[in-house]
Amino acid sequence: MIFTEITDDLTGAADSGSYFTARGRRLKICVSGDCDLSREDGQLLSVNLSSRNTPKDTARSLHRSLCEKLPHHGNTIFMKKIGTGFRGNDAYELEGLLQAWPDYLVFIIDNAPDLGTFTLYGHQYCEGQILPKSVYAKDPIFPPKESFIPDILGHDTNIPIGLVDIDAVKGGSLVEKTRAEIKRGCRILVFDAITRADTLHIIESLQPLYPKVFWTGSLGMADGLAQYLLSLIHI
């Protein structure tokens, strides 16, 4: 299985990449989309687009253009790294990815258990605080004003956004709820996740069923995907 990560800043590429290298994987970080995107056998690839603070249309076009350079097939796991607290051009970046590859979906799992960050009933919490009251409320550029992720993204995109809440994740109806949201026309799905186990459960349950997905999130997503890739090696 091939792995490619797309990030919106270089620090995020290094931070999220550390979860893979800590598990013994080799990682190549490209500082821009104009770099050589080739890789050695078994090497993971992370491409930084520095799009967090660019104009919105630029963020969209950078992601669309990168997809046009990458292999388009189902044996690659893609991760889209975003900043905790949705303090950037996330909706525009996701639009660019989905415009380039109309047969793909976006699955968002935004949690980082070590930092007290999680998603519950679609609302983002950071360091245990609801997003607008969290430490990110002091962000000088993108201070969050609301916490419900589908609404945050929905202000900047017309792509239908669905929610798979914690009741489905923990209650045994994860696959059924995901299928229903996709059937409803949603191309972006937000998943509740509180613990590491939640994230890994979502990935393990859905990746074999939906190989054409941009797995989107922050450090918790990187941790979950790194563990999932490790399990594939040991099968």
Label every model-predicted segment.
Residues 233-235:
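Conserved small/polar residues in nucleotide/adenosyl-binding loops
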Residues 1-2, 26-30, 43, 59, ...:
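Cap/lid and interdomain-hinge subdomains that line or gate substrate/regulatory clefts
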Residues 205-212:
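Soluble secreted/lumenal catalytic domains
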Residues 227-228:
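N-terminal extension/subdomain marker
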Residues 196, 216-224:
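A C-terminal functional module that forms or caps the active site or interfaces directly
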Residues 3-7, 106-108, 214-216:
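Short, hydrophobic/glycine-enriched beta-strand segments
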Residues 2-40, 111-114:
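N-terminal basic/disordered segments at the start of proteins
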Residues 44-57:
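Short, structured active-site "lid" loops
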